[in-house]
């Protein structure tokens, strides 16, 4: 460009830099020199392809770090005289035109120079770009190819068996899967072949045709086993309607993920929507189109063109959502084929000369249940597995496909209701559980309004975790040796007592009772074993990863949860002990202090209620035990097993031991998340809402020498009232008898559950049952009638003590209940918007029934009706509203911590960060709590009710106290 511009100037013989020019002609000269001298090409050489020009005096060469202006051109131009009279008059315009072009070119070079000066983005999500894209490819494969991988593994093993003519030595459950795979796959394929003959006559045919038979077989087997492991009805049994729905959902999901492979063009049979009939297109054509699409996707994947891949999926994803009716029809048919073709055979030594005992692995049964608090009973179909399948169920986790594993790279940022988190697996920002009104409101809410919620969920999802290999290794050792340690369930069943002779009716009656108790205990153990196996299998899958992430979403109230269901930080002590932050930070002086406090908190047993200095003293007095726990966790004194949270305590012991043994303890690296927990957090929110001084004192909204314990204070109030009642005359005051009996029973543990659940609107009957359970555990009274009446009295006194201490909370709860009652009486659901802009709709509506005829039986699907459950809307509003506030506080804290450079994880009312950052997090969480409650929350709520329901008259807001919220900023034990 420069060559062209200056070349044109020389050809026109423009005398534009002559010494004899007038003052007017010096303007272009100065302008040119200004342009040329201002072009800072420093450092551009590497970024741009600019070759030096050596003509007409030459362009001085560019040097790295320097810039020379075009001095030679000025000299040459001065030597040129015009020989054309017309050039004299037109020269000025020509020069200006050339200078304008030079200015444009200069700006272009400057722009390129600025871009070249910016280093390329070689770090993404804290890792090199190449590594990030490699992990991204793995993540996409994890989401899209797991079922295909499982099916391929079965095919390969079967092919290998045919070739070798030998049965491979496989684990028990894997051999079952393999034995079922071929007959189930063939049965499904027979169905698919039949569909081609009976076109349009089988209602579920168009759905099943969209996936290969082997993949449907694998999905059916794995989903069924997963449901039998984790189902609410008990291990080894699952409601047919639940199983059919979930298997149908899984098949639909896999069709959706892989739709671009079978829907390459609209002429293909599998491009039909659910309302169209499949055309008889040859398998060869479908295979060619599938392979073509597969290659296209592979090329895009190799180039990290994920957006193009997703666009391709959307382009070919033309089918409509199936709907629950279609899902259960597909699921029921697949379950039927599984039951008809999956068999099990006891080991050969279990039978003598007779034929082998081959029997179905699964069978359909019917159960009758009485609905809670009613005399109505309902019969439902269920699927049960054979005892031999049940026997291996708790060992099957390692052979199962587990969907929604933690992600290898940060989740996609949330940008819409179903846009965010996973790349291909369906992800929704809110768990609506089929509540149509909530789903509709969420979809209609402007993105800008939801930005604070999205940012908080993205922040939680971007926290990087890893497996604590030392703790996992120990857990595996304990589990391999039968469990029973650190809260792990016994891997062996309780022996069932032998049946006695029926002549002795008393013995037989006792045997039936003991047998029933043993069977129940074994079922509970089995369920716990399955749960632990699933958690450990996820840990084993992720242990060699450098790090991983948990995408989060919210429930309808706005509380955040990880999408992955098994191994996450919201789980048990086992989960939390196995997990740690991926990033390590030096402890520092403050971090070393907090690590010691953390050990005392995890040990608990009253130690966690002491002042901080006393907790530190406790830890320091047990350093020998801590070192021993770290060095010889099983062979030593096992001090860590006495902790309330043993595996988390062990992880902290290992970290503290490493730090104290290093030359510079404060420089030791820590990955342990340190917890700061709220003090009966629901009551903290009530005290702040009501500006309640007495309540604020009880739940640490104001500072004290040591943490206030609300449970102990309530117990003390209860005891004081009972002491007064015990002095009354039983003749005139019958409760005096129960007061005397209860005096020795009142303690923190007796009232704790009732105080905790008071936030959730615990009723008198609920409190009575809680206290009765505690008394039965202690074996206080042999007479059941006496236990019942004593519990009634104690519940009444406990609720009275709570109302006295938290008067403002009681008034606010009553106001919540009154408002909800009025709204629900008009057949409206209670709705509100959280301080972060999340719309909340209470989902409690009377269920309707929809009958669906399947190949197994007529199934009853639950359908939401327009009629609200008025009482549930009323009783649930107070706790749901408080939960929406604690969710808002956690999200506000998460975002602020992230902006301050802290790693953050949250479990509702428990906030976690690195030891060295606890002080900063403590400051932030207090500031955010004050910021939250400085807003007119109740006033805004009332205003929203009045706008939504203008024809309803609402009661006035309750009176509030004069507690100074700013005191929270100075409260040492607000969260501790």
From Swiss-Prot:
SUPFAM superfamilies: DNA/RNA polymerases. It is found in: Mitochondrion. Its EC number is 2.7.7.6. Disulfide bonds: none annotated. GO terms for biological process: DNA-templated transcription. One of its GO terms (molecular function) is DNA binding. This is DNA-directed RNA polymerase 1, mitochondrial. It comes from Arabidopsis thaliana.
């Amino acid at each position: 460009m420069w060559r062209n511009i200056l070349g044109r100037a020389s050809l026109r013989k423009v005398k534009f830099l002559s010494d004899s020019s007038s003052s007017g002609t010096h303007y272009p000269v100065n302008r040119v020199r200004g342009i040329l001298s201002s072009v800072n090409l420093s450092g551009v050489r590497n970024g741009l392809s600019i070759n030096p020009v050596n003509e007409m005096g030459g362009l001085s060469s560019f040097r790295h770090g320097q810039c020379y202006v075009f001095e030679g051109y000025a000299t040459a131009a001065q030597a040129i005289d015009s020989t054309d009279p017309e050039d004299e008059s037109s020269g000025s315009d020509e020069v200006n035109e050339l200078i304008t072009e030079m200015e444009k070119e200069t700006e272009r070079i400057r722009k390129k120079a600025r871009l070249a000066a910016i280093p390329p983005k070689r770090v993404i999500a804290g890792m090199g770009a190449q590594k990030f894209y490699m992990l991204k490819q793995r993540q996409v494969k994890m989401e899209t190819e797991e079922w295909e991988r499982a099916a391929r593994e079965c095919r390969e093993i079967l092919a290998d068996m045919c070739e070798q003519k030998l049965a491979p030595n496989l684990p028990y459950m894997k051999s079952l899967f393999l034995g079922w795979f071929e007959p189930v796959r063939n049965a499904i394929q027979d169905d698919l072949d039949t569909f081609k003959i009976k076109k349009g006559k089988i209602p579920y045919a168009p759905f099943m045709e969209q996936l290969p038979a082997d993949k449907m077989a694998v999905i059916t087997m794995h989903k069924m086993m997963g449901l039998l492991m984790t189902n609410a009805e008990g291990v080894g049994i699952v409601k047919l309607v639940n199983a059919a729905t979930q298997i149908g959902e899984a098949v639909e999901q896999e069709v959706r993920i892989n739709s671009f492979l079978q829907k390459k063009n609209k002429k293909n049979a599998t491009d039909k929507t659910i309302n169209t009939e499949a055309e008889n297109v040859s398998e060869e054509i479908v295979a060619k189109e599938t392979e073509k699409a597969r290659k296209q996707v592979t090329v895009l994947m190799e180039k990290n063109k994920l957006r193009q891949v997703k666009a391709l999926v959307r382009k070919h994803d033309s089918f409509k959502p199936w709907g629950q009716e279609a899902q259960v029809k597909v699921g029921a048919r697949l379950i039927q084929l599984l039951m008809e073709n999956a068999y099990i055979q006891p080991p050969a030594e279990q039978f003598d000369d007779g034929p082998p005992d081959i029997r179905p692995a699964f069978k359909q049964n019917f159960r009758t249940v009485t609905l809670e608090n009613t005399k109505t009973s309902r019969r439902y179909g269920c699927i049960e597995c054979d005892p031999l399948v049940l026997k291996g169920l708790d060992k099957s986790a390692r052979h199962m496909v587990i969907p929604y594993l933690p992600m290898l790279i940060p989740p996609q940022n949330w940008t819409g209701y179903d846009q965010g988190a996973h790349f291909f697996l369906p992800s929704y920002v809110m768990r609506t559980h089929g509540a149509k009104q909530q789903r509709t409101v969420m979809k209609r809410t402007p993105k800008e309004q939801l930005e604070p919620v999205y940012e908080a969920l993205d922040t939680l999802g971007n926290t990087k975790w890893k497996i604590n290999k030392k703790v996992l290794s120990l857990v595996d050792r304990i589990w391999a040796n039968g469990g029973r340690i650190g809260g792990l369930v016994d891997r062996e069943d309780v022996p069932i007592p032998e049946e006695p002779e029926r002549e002795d009716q008393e013995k037989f009656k006792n045997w039936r009772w003991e047998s029933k108790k043993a069977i129940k205990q074994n079922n509970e153990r089995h369920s716990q074993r399955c749960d632990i196996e699933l958690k450990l299998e996820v840990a084993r899958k992720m242990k060699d990863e450098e790090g991983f992430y948990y995408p989060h979403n919210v429930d309808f109230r706005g509380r955040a949860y990880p999408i992955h269901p098994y191994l996450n930080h919201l789980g048990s002590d086992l989960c939390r002990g196995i997990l740690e932050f991926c990033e390590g930070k030096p402890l520092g002086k403050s971090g070393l202090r907090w690590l010691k406090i953390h050990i005392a908190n995890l040990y608990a047993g009253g130690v966690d209620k002491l002042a901080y200095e006393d907790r530190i003293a406790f830890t320091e007095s047990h350093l020998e035990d801590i070192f021993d726990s770290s060095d010889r966790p099983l062979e030593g004194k096992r001090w860590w097993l006495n902790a309330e949270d043993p595996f988390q305590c062990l992880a902290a012991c290992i970290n503290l031991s490493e730090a104290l043994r290093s030359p510079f303890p404060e420089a030791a690296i820590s990955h342990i998340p340190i917890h700061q927990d709220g003090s009966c957090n629901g009551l903290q929110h009530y005290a702040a809402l009501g500006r309640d001084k007495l309540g604020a004192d009880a739940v640490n909204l104001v500072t004290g020498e040591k943490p206030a314990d609300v449970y102990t204070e309530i117990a003390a109030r209860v005891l004081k009232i009972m002491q007064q009642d015990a002095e009354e005359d039983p003749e005139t005051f019958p409760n005096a008898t129960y007061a005397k009996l209860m005096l020795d029973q009142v303690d923190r543990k007796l009232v704790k559950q009732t105080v905790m659940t008071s936030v959730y609107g615990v009723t008198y009957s609920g409190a009575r049952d809680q206290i009765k359970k505690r008394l039965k555990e202690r074996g206080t009274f042999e007479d059941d009638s006496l236990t019942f009446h004593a519990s009634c009295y104690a519940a009444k006194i406990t609720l009275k003590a709570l109302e006295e201490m938290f008067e403002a909370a009681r008034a606010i709860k009553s106001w919540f209940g009154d408002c909800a009652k009025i709204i629900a009486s008009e057949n409206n659901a209670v709705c509100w918007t959280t301080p972060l802009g999340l719309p909340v709709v209470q989902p409690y509506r009377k269920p309707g029934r929809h009958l669906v005829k399947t190949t197994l039986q007529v199934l009853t699907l639950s359908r939401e009706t327009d009629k609200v459950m008025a009482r549930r809307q009323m009783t649930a509003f107070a706790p749901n509203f408080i939960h929406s506030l604690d969710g808002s506080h956690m999200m506000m804290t998460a975002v602020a911590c992230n902006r301050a450079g802290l790693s953050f994880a949250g479990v509702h009312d428990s906030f976690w960060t690195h030891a060295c950052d606890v002080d900063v997090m403590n400051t932030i969480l207090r500031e955010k709590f004050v910021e939250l409650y400085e807003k007119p929350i109740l006033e805004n709520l009332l205003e929203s009710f009045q706008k939504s329901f203008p024809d309803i008259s609402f009661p006035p807001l309750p009176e509030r106290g004069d507690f100074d919220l700013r005191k929270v900023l100075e409260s040492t034990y607000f969260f501790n």
